[in-house]
Amino acid sequence: MSEKFKRDKKDRVLSIRDLNISFKTNYGIVNAIRGIRFDLFKGETVAIVGESGSGKSVTIKTIMGILDSNGMIDSGSIIYNYTDDNGNEQSVDLVQMSQKEIRYKFCGKKIAMVFQDPMTSLDPTMTIGKQIMEPMLEHQHVSREEAKKRTIELLGEVGIENPEKRFKQYPHELSGGMRQRVVIAIALACDPDILICDEPTTALDVTIQAKILELIKRLQNEKNISVIYITHDLGVVAKVADYVAVMYAGRIVEK
C-alpha cells in the first residue's frame, strides 16, 4: 500500500469478508471465489490484479448486483457503509440483499462503474447529453433543466471542450478517448461513493491511456471518491494504486 494513504477504520467504505461464490454448470459446481477478504477506505484506490478467470470480474459483479443467474453466494459478507439521502450514516450487508435491490438502491447512484470499451457502454441511438442525464433523472429527482445544466458542467469537468456542442452529439461523432471521458461523466453523474473501473484504458492507445488515468485520479481527489481498479496491467497498478490485491484461482494470494 502507498505510504501516502493512511487507512482509518472510521473511513472504511467497503469490507469484504470470507466471500465464497460458486456457479452451477453442466459439469457440476465450480468454486469461483474462495474466501476472499479486503477493505476499501474513503478516497483510497484499490487495484485487483489477476489473469482472466482469476475471479476479479465475479467479485465486482457481486458488489454491483449483476452476478450471473447461475452464480451463488455460498457464504461471507460485503459490508457497505454509506450516507443516505437524509444525511444519516448507514451500514448494510450486500450479501443479504437481492441483486434487484442492490441495483435499484445503489447501482449507478452510490456505486458506479466505468467499463473498458466505451463503444459498447454507450447507446449509439442516444445523444451524449441524454445518456449522462439519465441516471440523474432516475436517481436524483431533479428537473430536466437542472440535469442538463449539471451534464454540461460534468462534460467540462472530464475535460471535454465545447460541452454545449458535445451535449447534442452521438457517440460515433467522438474519438475513443472522448467517449471514455463521457463514460466517466455518466459514472460520476450521481456523485457516487465508489467508482469501479474495469480495465478503463484497455481499448485506448497509450497516449490516451495516461490522460484517462490522470483524469480519474484528479476527479477522485476532488470528490474524495473510493476507486477499485480491475486490471491485469501492472503499469496501471504502479501509477494509481494505494493497495493491491492479487487474485489467482478465486483467491487473493498476495496483498
Report residues per predicted region.
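Conserved ABC ATPase signature
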Residues: 169-174, 178
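Conserved ABC ATPase "signature" region
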Residues: 146-165
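P-loop NTP-binding/switch modules centered on Walker-like glycine-rich loops
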Residues: 204, 208-255
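The feature captures the beta-strand-to-loop junction immediately N-terminal to the Walker
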Residues: 49-51
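ABC ATPase NBD Q-loop/coupling interface
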Residues: 77-105, 143, 214
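A short, proline-enriched helix->beta-strand linker immediately N-terminal to the Walker B motif
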Residues: 189-193
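A short, flexible loop at the N-terminus of ABC-type nucleotide-binding domains that lies
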Residues: 9-13, 22-35, 66-72, 84-91, ...
